[in-house]
Amino acid sequence: MDPIDLLRDVAKSFSTNEEIASTERVSVDITRLSLFREAKLAEARDKLQDQIRQRDLCQESVAGDSTTSERTQHVHELEREKMRLARAINDLEETLNATQAATSKLNAELELVEKESQQPIESAVENDSSAALQLKLFRTLGVTFDAEKPEKYTKCMIRSNTTSNVATLDLNVKEYSGFFITNYIWDKL
């Protein structure tokens, strides 16, 4: 079979649509959360303005009658409420900023995924050696190699997608044939 056809078949089996859909769902949720928080922020500001008006009215009335301790206590309560609302507004603004930063990051990741999914297979075949292509194919299947020396692989780790287990195979054992190693890897996948 032609390597280009093989790579096309392998590429067709991989889909980024789920990741893109997930990212879009997260983006919609973040937008919805931002709108909700903006509404809460506007509501909190309106409450704060009402509290400030009430406080000002109370202060005016207290100025005329400074002997009333109830009014003074009410003014203090309004001041505490004003401070609590101001803190809530600050917290909402911080959360909104963090949400916007997360949205920007997710959009950048979405663009990267879209760019990667649009790269032609032919350029990968032309630019990579057959050994590099084999290693990429193994990695996509869940097989990685660990080397003590860069030129020689000493251990193979196989991650099974069906059982979520990781099996290791020592490649330094001389009794293992290429046939045995290949069968072992495929059995573990």
UniProtKB/Swiss-Prot annotation:
Record GO biological process: cell division; chromosome segregation; sister chromatid biorientation
Keyword check for Transferase: no
Residue intervals passing through the bilayer: none
Assembly: Component of the NDC80 complex, which consists of NDC80, NUF2, SPC24 and SPC25.
Entry's family note: Belongs to the SPC24 family.
PANTHER family referenced in this protein's UniProt entry, alphabetically: KINETOCHORE PROTEIN SPC24 (PTHR22142:SF2), PTHR22142
Described function: Acts as a component of the essential kinetochore-associated NDC80 complex, which is required for chromosome segregation and spindle checkpoint activity.
Name of the molecule in the record: Probable kinetochore protein SPC24
Organism (species): Yarrowia lipolytica (strain CLIB 122 / E 150) (Yeast)
Gene that encodes the chain: SPC24
